[in-house]
């Protein structure tokens, strides 16, 4: 479970970061 959660977070975090970067 934690493995899947970590993988999901690793994929989501950069995505969110990119979104904020593009907005800025």
From Swiss-Prot:
- Where, subcellularly, is it found? Secreted; Target cell membrane
UniProt GO cellular component terms: extracellular region; membrane; other organism cell membrane
- Which example biological process does GO assign this protein? monoatomic ion transport
Tissue-wise expression:
Expressed by the venom gland.
- Which Pfam families does the record match to this protein? Antimicrobial_4 (PF08024)
Q: Does the keyword Cytoplasm apply?
A: no
Q: Which domain of life is it from?
A: Eukaryota
Q: Which UniProt keywords apply?
A: Antibiotic, Antimicrobial, Cytolysis, Fungicide, Hemolysis, Ion transport, Membrane, Secreted, Target cell membrane, Target membrane, Transmembrane, Transport
Query: Which InterPro entries does the record match to this protein?
Result: Antimicrobial_4
Q: Which family does it belong to?
A: Belongs to the non-disulfide-bridged peptide (NDBP) superfamily. Medium-length antimicrobial peptide (group 3) family.
Quaternary state and interactors = Homooligomer.
Purpose of the protein? Disrupts cell membranes through formation of pores. Has strong antimicrobial activity against Gram-positive bacteria B.subtilis, S.epidermidis, E.faecalis and S.aureus. Is less active against Gram-negative bacteria P.aeruginosa and E.coli. Also increases efficacy of antibiotics (ampicillin, chloramphenicol, streptomycin, kanamycin, novobiocin) when tested against E.coli, probably by facilitating their incorporation into the bacteria. Possesses antifungal activity against C.albicans and hemolytic activity against human, sheep and pig erythrocytes.
- Put simply, this protein is called Pandinin-2
């Amino acid at each position: 479970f934690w493995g899947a959660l970590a993988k999901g977070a690793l994929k989501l975090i950069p995505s969110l970061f990119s979104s904020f970067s593009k907005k800025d």
